[in-house]
Amino acid sequence: MPGTAVHFNELELFFRQTRFAELVQYFVEMDDDSDDAEAVFPTSEPSRVSEGSENESGSGEEYEGAPHVHFQESTATEEPRTPSKTPASQTTQSIGRTVSIAEATRRASQESPRQTETAGSSSAPDALSTQQPPLEHSTQQNIPTKLPSTQQAVERVVSSQTTSRAAETRERSPEHTEASTQEAETAEEALNKEEFWNLYRSLESKSYISRENVPDIRLLVMCLKANLEIQGEFDRRRVGLKNRLYIILKDLVEEPWELRAYRGCRSADGLTLSVSFKYKNRPQFSGVKVDLEPKFLQESVVNIYYTISFTVRNVRPLTHSV
């Protein structure tokens, strides 16, 4: 609702991917009035922050805050690409063909002298023209007769490799089976529809949700993610569930607090710092101007620690999607 204070002076929680309990406490306390914000999140002395420009989603937000979250420009890294390899079957088959040709040549060279001696002893001297043809010709004739057996051997090698790979797959399959079993057990541990709504009503009746209720909220969130039927009924009842607990569960399921990118740079005069934040399922907050204190104007300063809090006015529905 307009005028609701959104406190981002605990942005270190986002940068460090904090624990679930702290995130729940954050969503619980961020719904408090702006007058009680300082008691919940005490800040240092506020410094001047100029009005920010409109963000990329088109909603006109004004930011007012006080510099102290660790700022560091994010850099994207690409995973190295592995070169494609020749399939083992093709390599084995080509090697088998080379070996078969060499073996056929060797056997032909061994058999040709024997055939020549046999023909010379049984025939007349003038029958030399009917003897075994030259070595090259006999080699070319014997190669086709030797190839089928060698090719069968190659096929046996390939089939044995396939069998060994299948055995390795069967050995690894218990791990995947165990993982799927754990997922099934986790789904079974989730609440059914009746238990879910009973637990939800018990939390809804509480005037204040504390850290002691974090396990129950975790169970509700896990149930919403695992059971699509309950999730659909939860969305259909959103008109009657527009209270603090509904907002907390919806935010925890959608995980909007996940910070996708953040960056900042000094202005040309070096007196201000321009910061931009991009969250999951939320538009980008850009153009946040922070006045730098004199101690940060030194050239040797690389990282600047600050806390920034701002109030969003002219609230509009956040329809940006990643």
Swiss-Prot record:
Alphabetized UniProt keyword annotations: Plasmid, Plasmid partition
Residue stretches of biased makeup (Polar residues): 72-97, 110-166
Region ranges (Disordered): 35-188
Disulfide partners: none
Compositional bias of kind Basic and acidic residues: 167-178
GO terms classed as biological process: plasmid partitioning
Name of this protein: Trans-acting factor B
Keyword Cell membrane: no
Physiological role: Plasmid partition require REP1, REP2, and a cis-acting DNA sequence (known as STB). REP1 may act by intercalating in the yeast nuclear matrix and binding STB either directly or via REP2.
